[in-house]
Regions:
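Short, catalytically relevant binding-site loops at active-site mouths
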Residues: 160-164, 191, 197-200, 229-230
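Alpha/beta catalytic barrel-like cores
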Residues: 1-119, 124-129, 187, 231-232, ...
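Catalytic beta/alpha-barrel core
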Residues: 60-65, 121-135, 171, 175-203
Length: 294
């Protein structure tokens, strides 16, 4: 039986969630704006600032244990109306760069995450067409055991990557649908997918591909913003919602362009809050409530 997403949702049943679980990729973003090394404490402070400023306007906030979740809890900056999602993935990749592989983080204790107030667990799968579905299923099963142990909803994110074998063909738009179909067997309570066509071009084409993802995955799903330019994201969310998505769980499109600002909290208030409010209005109007998915 699918676990309820009530604690992650707006009163409308739509999901308007902010991600700030980026780790080395976030360090790389800050490094582009400064000549000095980016310490862990700078990443933690950014996550605390995001939680303090944006959580009153988000239905949930996704945070990692490595740099964020304990500081956010200790400093009591999360709005009571905002659910907390704990990232349970270990991101493998170069310092200051994007993840190239993932694993279940052995240091994430699902019972501790639940006891400090988390209302969901998230895991990232990097999907390549030349890697075996069996290996992905093994990872997902390990993650789902954490969710079963804690009783927390399972949120599975998929990012489709080009194959490691460069001789193999790669059709991103088609493989978004193939990956969603595979994920329909993973017992996720919520699926997190990339926006078709990176949110650019014909809105109707985006909606049509979103409908295909809806039909393939069979569970509530939301879009992420990685790969979508911020000016296109609101329209992309609307197009995907019209295709059956239940909202968004996004980071970069909400806050990436204020990284490096001299006053991060002020920039979040000036730039990110209006953006988030607009996105919330869109999903309230167009998204399919998670509870309507049977």
């Amino acid at each position: 039986m699918r676990r309820a997403l009530t604690n992650l949702a707006r009163p409308s049943g739509a999901l308007a969630m902010v991600a700030v679980d980026q780790r080395e990729a976030l360090r790389g973003m800050f490094a582009a704006h400064q000549s000095t090394p980016v310490p862990d404490s700078q990443l933690t402070q950014f996550k605390v600032d995001v939680a303090r400023e944006l959580s009153p306007f988000a239905s949930a906030l996704l945070v990692d244990q490595e740099f964020g979740i304990d500081a956010i809890i200790d400093q009591k900056v999360l709005a009571p109306t905002c659910g907390l999602i704990a990232a349970a993935d270990l991101l493998v990749g170069p310092a200051g760069g994007a993840a190239t592989d993932t694993a279940v983080d052995p240091d994430v204790d699902p019972l501790r995450m639940r006891d400090i107030g988390s209302v969901g667990l998230k895991f990232l799968v990097l999907w390549r067409n030349d890697e075996s579905p069996e290996s992905r299923l093994k990872l997902v099963d390990e993650f789902n055991q954490l969710c079963a142990k804690s009783g927390l909803p399972s949120i599975i994110e998929v990012i489709v990557k080009p194959p490691t074998d460069s001789s193999r063909s790669f059709d991103r738009e088609e493989e978004l649908v193939i990956a969603a179909k595979e994920a329909s067997t993973w017992s996720a309570d919520l699926y997190k997918a990339e926006v078709p066509f990176h949110g650019e071009g014909d809105a109707l084409a985006i909606t049509r591909n979103a409908q295909r993802i809806t039909e393939a995955v069979g569970t509530p799903w939301v879009v992420l913003s990685n790969g979508v330019k911020a000016p296109f994201f609101a329209d992309a969310v609307k197009a995907c919602a019209q295709g059956g998505a239940s909202g968004f769980l996004a980071g970069r499109a909400v806050w990436a362009d204020i990284v490096g600002a001299p006053d991060i909290p002020a920039a979040l208030r000036e730039v990110s809050i209006p953006r988030l409010e607009k996105l919330a209005e869109i999903v309230d109007q167009y998204a399919r409530p998670w509870s309507d998915v049977r």
